[in-house]
Amino acid sequence: MGKYDRYISFKNANWESQSSGVMDGLKPHIEAADSPFWVYFMRQRELAHQRGLDDLRVLHNFLPTLRELLEELDDQPTLALLEQLEESCM
């Protein structure tokens, strides 16, 4: 992977794959539906996709809440993916 500067371009940032990885990590929590937040999150994701927005935008919009929930759930792998995505692409 080439070097990039996130403030200039997402070229070589692999943001689509990183976003997909975070969404894959969230999937078990969404399916468990232990929090009403997940229903709201998925509805907002659906609306964002209808407006042509991608998962990077959705994840960015909910970053603090997702971080807090992942910490509470002690999901360190998904939290690490989210933090990597934030650092490299947000």
Curated annotation (Swiss-Prot):
It comes from the Bacteria. It holds the Pfam family CowN. Keywords: Nitrogen fixation. GO terms for biological process: nitrogen fixation. InterPro entries: CowN. The keyword Transferase does not apply. HAMAP family: CowN. Belongs to the CowN family. Is required to sustain N(2)-dependent growth in the presence of low levels of carbon monoxide (CO). Probably acts by protecting the N(2) fixation ability of the nitrogenase complex, which is inactivated in the presence of CO. This is N(2)-fixation sustaining protein CowN.
